[in-house]
Amino acid sequence: MILVNRETRVLVQGITGREGQFHTKQMLDYGTKIVAGVTPGKGGTEVLGVPVYDTVKEAVAHHEVDASIIFVPAPAAADAALEAAHAGIPLIVLITEGIPTLDMVRAVEEIKALGSRLIGGNCPGIISAEETKIGIMPGHVFKRGRVGIISRSGTLTYEAAAALSQAGLGTTTTVGIGGDPVIGTTFKDLLPLFNEDPETEAVVLIGEIGGSDEEEAAAWVKDHMKKPVVGFIGGRSAPKGKRMGHAGAIIMGNVGTPESKLRAFAEAGIPVADTIDEIVELVKKALG
């Protein structure tokens, strides 16, 4: 497991909103330790037995917090993430999509400088199977096992996790890094953590067209990775210049093309699955 486990104490920013309340219940049902919530103007109330504060600073004065998850509307989401980082919260999971790109550029830089780790935006979050879920993924498809997943896609992640669970391989930690062009944590940031994690025996890297994160990850794998990695690239049939579902899934010139990603994976010795079921076959093969 990496980053989170059943002891991780979680703050929910935007806990009183519709999504915030719904997912707080889902996370609590999964066993996640939610210690506090924040919604400006709603301090002193409770949501599902969780105390609500007006500010993150106030919440951390009353509770030990290891991670924050953010369900705040797009115009205020980057500021919410910065508020968490300034309060010293080490892990920040930003679910919100549609955050202005310039807001994200600023937030990512500042959060890094403050020493916190940002996952997202526009991501499903992070789950350590059967331990804790800090996100919006369907918890029941994640069975505890041997494979780490890092993904730019939400739904493909759930399908891959379900397939690995059904095959008896299961997952350790799964991180949805988000589908936007500017995100806080990339494949390359997480690979070293899985590389050192005693429970993870193989890693599935679910990329998609657009950007160069997959290429950078492949270069890192080639030079440093001790464990087998299996790749998958979503959106391989997409035409150039057309955004496919995610803001980050757009091919500009020769950067972000499926060919460029497949070439990088091939050079790093990463086998690439064409289907979700093939991910399972390749992981089985890699683990012997």
UniProtKB/Swiss-Prot annotation:
Descriptive protein name: Succinate--CoA ligase [GDP-forming] subunit alpha
Residues annotated as catalytic: H246 (tele-phosphohistidine intermediate)
Alphabetical keyword list: Ligase, Nucleotide-binding, Tricarboxylic acid cycle
Function statement: Succinyl-CoA synthetase functions in the citric acid cycle (TCA), coupling the hydrolysis of succinyl-CoA to the synthesis of either ATP or GTP and thus represents the only step of substrate-level phosphorylation in the TCA. The alpha subunit of the enzyme binds the substrates coenzyme A and phosphate, while succinate binding and nucleotide specificity is provided by the beta subunit. Can use either ATP or GTP, but prefers GTP.
Record: residues binding substrate: Y158
Pathway(s): Carbohydrate metabolism; tricarboxylic acid cycle; succinate from succinyl-CoA (ligase route): step 1/1
Protein residues bound to CoA: T16, G17, R18, E19, K42, I95, T96, E97
Family: Belongs to the succinate/malate CoA ligase alpha subunit family.
NCBIfam families documented for this protein: PRK05678.1, sucCoAalpha
Keyword Protease: no
Gene Ontology CC entries for this record: succinate-CoA ligase complex (ADP-forming)
InterPro entries for this protein: Cit_synth/succinyl-CoA_lig_AS, Citrt_syn/SCS-alpha_CS, CoA-bd, CoA_lig_alpha, NAD(P)-bd_dom_sf, SUCC_ACL_C, Succinyl-CoA_synth-like
Recorded catalytic activity of this chain's protein: GTP + succinate + CoA = succinyl-CoA + GDP + phosphate; succinate + ATP + CoA = succinyl-CoA + ADP + phosphate
GO MF term list: nucleotide binding; succinate-CoA ligase (ADP-forming) activity; succinate-CoA ligase (GDP-forming) activity
UniProt keyword Transmembrane helix present: no
Quaternary structure note: Heterotetramer of two alpha and two beta subunits.
One GO biological process term: tricarboxylic acid cycle
Enzyme kind, highest EC tier: ligase
pH dependence: Optimum pH is 8.0-8.4.
